[in-house]
Design a protein with these regions (language model features):
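Loop-to-transmembrane helix boundary motifs in multi-pass membrane proteins
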Residues: 19-20, 56-65, 180-191, 197-198, ...
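Helix-loop junctions at the membrane interface of multi-pass solute transporters
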Residues: 1, 71, 147-182, 193, ...
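Selective recognition of specific alpha-helical transmembrane segments in multi-pass small-molecule
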Residues: 26-34, 70, 90-107, 154, ...
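Hydrophobic alpha-helical segments and their helix-loop junctions in multi-pass secondary transporters
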Residues: 34-38, 42-52, 58-74, 93-130
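Hydrophobic transmembrane alpha-helices that form the core helical bundles
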Residues: 1-53, 241-263
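Hydrophobic, small-residue-rich membrane helices and short re-entrant helix-turn-helix hairpins
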Residues: 6-7, 76-90, 156-189, 206-220, ...
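Extracellular/periplasmic helix-exit of transmembrane alpha-helices
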Residues: 1, 105-123, 180-222
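Flexible loop linkers connecting adjacent transmembrane helices
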Residues: 1-18, 177, 202-227, 255-259
C-alpha cells in the first residue's frame, strides 16, 4: 500500500468514519506505548547497582536522556539515526538468543512435559501441573496464545510496518523482510520462553518472586548470567535498556507520520518541530 499508515489503509478499504476511528485509536496506542518506553528503560537503568549513589542512578536523568534521543529519532530522517543503530541492536539480539539456545542444548535441563495437551479441553487438565491456572488465578487459555502471538506479530507491530515499507527499494523484498522478521521474532520468543522455563524449576511462584523483587530486568539478567556468565550479564544489561528504547523511538516517529499522513501535512522542518515538540512535552509530563 505504498507505505501508507494503518488509518490510511483502513480508510481506503472501508470509509472515512472508520479511518477516523482508527486514527484516534492508533494515535493513542502509539503515544502511550512511547510513554511506557520512556519510563520503563529509565527505571531499569536508574536501578542498576553500578549506578548507585551517582547521577546515573537518578530516574529523571535517564528520562531526559531518553527523551532527547526520541526527539532526534522522531525529527530526523530515518537513515540518520535509526538505521545506523538498529543493525547493532539486531546483532545483539541474535547473539544473545543464539548463545542462550546453544547453552540450553549443552546443559540439557530437565523441562516439564506438557503431556496430553488435549486433556485441557476435556476438563481433566487440573491433573496436569503445567496446565493449572497460575496462583493469581489467570487461565492458561487464552493467555498463552496472547503471549505467543505477541512474540510474532501484534497490533503495535502493524503500526511500524509503514516505516519498513518506506525503506524497501523493491517490492520483491516485502515477503522475505516481513515474513522473515515474523518467523525470527517467533523463534526468539520460543528460545527465551524455553530458557525461562528451564531457569525457574520452581515454576510460576519462583518467577513471580523474582519479578516482585526486581521486575523483568532482573529476570533477564538471571537467565543470561545463569547460562552465559559475566558476558551474559553485560549483554543483558545492554539489552534490557536498549530494546524498550527501540520501541519507544519508532512509536513516536510512527505517531508523527500517522498524523502527517492523515492531514497531508508537508514534512518541512518547521512542521516536524510543531508536531514533535508538543507530543514529547506531553509525554514528559506524563512521566512525572
Amino acid at each position: 500500500e505504498d507505505g501508507k499508515s494503518l488509518p490510511e489503509i483502513a480508510g481506503h478499504y472501508f470509509n472515512i468514519y472508520f479511518k477516523g476511528v482508527m486514527l484516534l485509536f492508533t494515535a493513542m496506542l502509539l503515544f502511550f506505548v512511547g510513554v511506557v518506553f520512556i519510563m520503563s528503560p529509565a527505571g531499569l537503568l536508574s536501578n542498576l547497582d553500578y549506578f548507585k549513589d551517582t547521577i546515573f542512578g537518578n530516574n529523571t536523568f535517564w528520562v531526559l536522556v531518553i527523551l532527547a534521543y526520541y526527539f532526534l529519532a522522531t525529527m530526523l530522517p530515518i537513515d540518520k539515526i535509526i538505521t545506523k543503530l538498529y543493525p547493532a541492536f539486531g546483532l545483539l539480539m541474535i547473539v544473545m538468543t543464539t548463545s542462550i539456545a546453544v547453552a540450553l542444548l549443552i546443559n540439557a535441563p530437565q523441562l516439564p512435559e506438557m503431556g496430553d495437551v488435549f486433556a485441557y479441553f476435556n476438563h481433566s487438565h487440573y491433573n496436569n501441573e503445567l496446565l493449572e491456572p497460575n496462583p493469581d488465578g489467570l487461565p492458561i487459555w487464552p493467555l498463552l496464545f496472547v503471549t505467543i502471538t505477541c512474540g510474532a506479530i501484534s497490533g503495535f507491530h502493524s503500526t511500524q510496518a509503514p516505516i519498513i515499507a518506506r525503506c524497501l527499494t523493491n517490492e520483491k523484498y516485502v515477503r522475505p523482510v516481513y515474513y522473515g522478521a515474523m518467523v525470527c521474532e517467533g523463534i526468539v520468543a520460543c528460545v527465551w520462553a524455553l530458557a525461562g522455563v528451564a531457569a525457574f524449576p520452581g515454576g510460576y511462584p519462583e518467577l513471580k518472586a523474582m519479578l516482585d523483587l526486581g521486575g523483568p530486568g532482573l529476570v533477564v539478567n538471571h537467565i543470561a548470567t545463569g547460562y552465559l556468565g559475566v558476558l551474559g550479564g553485560v549483554m543483558a544489561i545492554v539489552a534490557v535498556a536498549v530494546f524498550p528504547i527501540t520501541s519507544g523511538d519508532t512509536a513516536f516517529r510512527s505517531l508523527r507520520l500517522t498524523i502527517v499522513d492523515a492531514f497531508n501535512i508537508p514534512q518541512s522542518l518547521r512542521n516536524r518541530l510543531l508536531l514533535s515538540v508538543p507530543i514529547l512535552a506531553i509525554a514528559y509530563f506524563m512521566t512525572l
